Amino acid sequence: MADDVQLESSVRFTQTGPQTIVLEKDLDTEYMIVNMGPQHPSTHGVLRVELLTDGEVVVKATAHLGYLHRCFEKHAEYVDYPGIVPYVDRMDYLASMNNDFAYCVAVEKLLGIEIPRRIEFMRVIVAELNRIASHLVAIGTYAIDLGAFTPFLFCFRDREHLLNLLEWICGARMLYNYIWVGGVSHDFPAKFEERVMEFVRYFKPQARELYQLLTENEIFVQRTKDIGLLPADVAINAGASGPMLRGSGVKWDLRRDDPYSIYPELEFDVAVPDGKASVIGDCLSRHLVRAIEIDESLKMIEQCIDMMPKDPNFDPHAAVPKRVKPKAGEVYARGEAPRGELGFYIISDGKGTTPFRCKARSSCFVNLSLLPEMAKGQYIADVVAIIGSVDIVLGEVDR
């Protein structure tokens, strides 16, 4: 028999030795399209991901957006500057304090308002409390996406303490409308600082336990380690920020690298993975960054409580303008939200009390654009882990 005898166009007999004959057939495979969402628990909102697959391997991933589009930027052209704050609340509804913080900094920059020092500390305290609450949702829901139920219960148990604190100062558990242009809606209640310090002391060991639950659970590590790799250069070129960028080993945090408010006075470390428990740039790295950031936020809250000026006659509305009508001009201000850089570009024509243009720079939208890069070549089951590691909020993506 010849060494290679062609029987059909796709079937061959190959003699590899005196006794061995191997039948080979080239299988013709077809790509299949798998739709994840828009009603899918792992997408954490109305997101549809179209997966082009070869068997169980993803060849291409395409995110379809717009299911939660509410015309925020167009509405902002017909609402006065203070009235936009409730709209901003509803973008990333898990981190409303940070949304309001960034927006109010932009308007105050446009107006040239100087904020009282106590208010600056109050804003940072509530923003960092909200950051911890947001990260607890991210970590807890991510764990349950991958089948780990216990961390989910731990995270939401401790998040209740934070929501109770935030409810105490503004009456709402979500969509706070607490940070105003030029100030805040209310001063802290009596003994609020003491309650915050009690929470910090209680939660420090809980945060360490949460970190161990993530790094010492073999199944969780196997589902996230070396999955959805995002190289640092790709993340930088795409404009990624927050835990997405820091998870790829890039030490970039606006609170340190483009500081605002009183962040330059605070001592904290930029959270990046060390590469021991995870592979730099994978799903596990991004989630470890969030766990580490919780510790750093606790440090900042402690410092703010110690450094904040005490004034029994403090007026939280002292710098709040009665009428916001800025001169013609434009401004861009940004802040470090839990999911990355949240910026507002505002144009005033100087003619009225509404902005000519209010553009929001969404960290979630930019980070989600990297999904095709991370999902390519991965299994369908791992796409769940990848989407969860991005930690998107569709209210901010679609706006």
UniProtKB/Swiss-Prot annotation:
It is found in: Cell inner membrane. Its EC number is 7.1.1.-. It catalyses: a quinone + NADH + 5 H(+)(in) = a quinol + NAD(+) + 4 H(+)(out). Its main location: membrane. One of its GO terms (molecular function) is NADH:ubiquinone reductase (non-electrogenic) activity. One of its GO terms (cellular component) is plasma membrane. It is a peripheral membrane protein. It holds the Pfam family Complex1_49kDa. Keywords: Cell inner membrane, Cell membrane, Membrane, NAD, Quinone, Translocase, Transport. InterPro entries: NADH_Q_OxRdtase_suD, NDH1_su_D/H, NiFe-Hase_large. Belongs to the complex I 49 kDa subunit family. NDH-1 is composed of 14 different subunits. Subunits NuoB, C, D, E, F, and G constitute the peripheral sector of the complex. NDH-1 shuttles electrons from NADH, via FMN and iron-sulfur (Fe-S) centers, to quinones in the respiratory chain. The immediate electron acceptor for the enzyme in this species is believed to be a menaquinone. Couples the redox reaction to proton translocation (for every two electrons transferred, four hydrogen ions are translocated across the cytoplasmic membrane), and thus conserves the redox energy in a proton gradient. This is NADH-quinone oxidoreductase subunit D 2.
